[in-house]
Amino acid sequence: MLYQQISQNKQRTVVLLVVFFALLALIGASAGYLLLDNYAMGLVLALVIGVIYATSMIFQSTSLVMSMNNAREVTEKEAPGFFHIVEDMAMVAQIPMPRVFIIEDPSLNAFATGSSPQNAAVAATTGLLEVMNREELEGVIGHEISHIRNYDIRISTIAVALASAVTVISSIGGRMLWYGGGSRRQRDDGDDDVLRIITLLLSLLSLLLAPLVASLIQLAISRQREYLADASSVELTRNPQGMIKALEKLQLSQPMKHPVDDASAALYINEPRKKRSFSSLFSTHPPIEERIERLKNM
């Protein structure tokens, strides 16, 4: 059951990424049709923008991400218990030892970052280290080490970049149309061709809806990688109860004291900001109750 869950989560992520690239291609083709009368050029430009943006975000400095989240790097001497758990989990996962950081915050949380296992880092709040016992900490750190081993940070970064690219292209396309960028097409093609009218309307509709759809896909990918990291943590620790108990404590945690931006929020094991009341479709994390239920059903 454990390996089936891991396999299913990986497959769902692949499907979502394929849909994401298809959406980016669609929005590019739509903008190209409306503004340049050229589907292909718009499609190529959209994909190029997406790839460049994703590449630049992937190689964002690990130290910069840690600094943005008020994390301080610690040595084995400063935090031996935490350091040794990270070391043990990295050894089991067969990845290089990540850098270790602590965030001075009473909330219970942790996250990992880095584009690859070779330049990764793990951070935990002081609240988490004070409240959780070793069994629970192993579950949490196993979760974060799994994110590193599974290249989740890279996948999530690509998803954020693609969502941003879709939004930027839609915004530029909409502004150019608003200020008369599409007027030439309307004058030149002033016939009653039903197909052209339908194509025009569909292109306009895609420009309007694409940012929302892109955001939903990006959030769905983030939730799937959380499920995968939970299951992968159990694979590393061979102790589902440790992960379950950790999640039960995380469920009671207060929001973090310092502000957390959207990109960083998706990295944490638990939503670091105030819980929102709207649909889970708009959440970076699946409900903890569902995560616990999945682990119990393994």
UniProtKB/Swiss-Prot annotation:
Active site (record annotation): E144
Domain of life: Bacteria
Main location: membrane
Membrane topology of the entry: Multi-pass membrane protein
GO biological process: proteolysis
Presence of keyword Isomerase: no
Family matches, as InterPro entries: HtpX_protease, Pept_M48_protease_HtpX, Peptidase_M48
GO molecular function: metalloendopeptidase activity; zinc ion binding
GO annotations of cellular component type: plasma membrane
Family per similarity comment: Belongs to the peptidase M48B family.
The name this protein goes by in its record: Protease HtpX homolog
Organism annotation: Streptococcus pyogenes serotype M1
